[in-house]
Every structure is written in C-alpha cells, then in structure tokens.
Amino acid sequence: MSAYSKVNLLELENSAQAKAAGVDARFARSHIDSEHLGVSRFRYPPNFQPTDGHSHREQEEVYVVLGGSGKVRLNDDVMDVKQWDVVRVAPSTIRGFAAGADGLELLAVASDRPEAGDGQPAKDWWT
C-alpha cells in the first residue's frame, strides 16, 4: 500500500442510482486503500424523503453538510441541518437524511469497519 492516494469522488460510480431515483452516492474507501477511514459523498434531490435508515455494528460516522438543507433523523430525534453543519453519529444510532426544497449534499467520513462491512438496514423506518 502506498503512503498516500487520491481520487475524485465525482469520477466514482454512483452506487445509489438503481436504488433511489435522483440520489447520488459515491464511496471512496476501496479506491483510496484506507485502513481506517472511509469518505463518501451523498447528493439528494429537492424534497427527497427517505423511507429507510441504517445503523452500524462498529462504524462511527461524521456527516458534513456541504450544501442545501434538510433534516436528519437520529433514532427518534429529528433535527434541521444546513450548510456546514457537522453531525456525529454513534454506530448503533439509526440515521437518515431528508432534503429540503434546495436539495442536500453531504460528505460522510467513517471510521474502521469489518472487512465485509457492518451496515444494518432499517427498512420502512422513516415513514
């Protein structure tokens, strides 16, 4: 492994387009050979409302709102978010984001995780 790596998030595959219309999700972890961190970019269209959330067994995440506004739901708490807000989420907390009228763009930084991942879907959680 090299001592450094570089990748452009917008040049990576959109991993969400088949799952949610208009949502853009790009994950850099496997492209930068990081042992301890993952970086992802999420873009939600205006007024996007999720139905599902997710949690993790081990992985802590920090989300930075790069643009737009919306809401974040953390377990049963819902908070407004706007540009440059930073939200830290413990692994077991179920989380999800909804976009406001101006859409929502996030950068997520994630800690260590098991090799196979540790995401836990929460289906129909935000309905």
Residue ranges: model-predicted function:
Residues V65-L66, R73-N75, A98, L107:
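Beta-strand residues in well-ordered beta-sheet regions across diverse protein folds
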Residues M1-L37, P46, D52, D118-T127:
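A short, N-terminal "cap"/entry segment at the start of jelly-roll beta-barrel domains
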Residues A3, G96-T127:
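Double-stranded beta-helix
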Residues D52, V72-R73, V89, I94-A101:
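Short beta-strand His + acidic residue motifs that chelate non-heme Fe in jelly-roll/DSBH
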Residues R41-P45, S55-R73:
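Short, conserved beta-strand element in jelly-roll/cupin
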Residues D76-S92:
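Short acidic-glycine-tyrosine-enriched beta hairpin
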Residues E58, D77, T93, D102-G103:
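A generic "binding-loop/recognition-motif" signal
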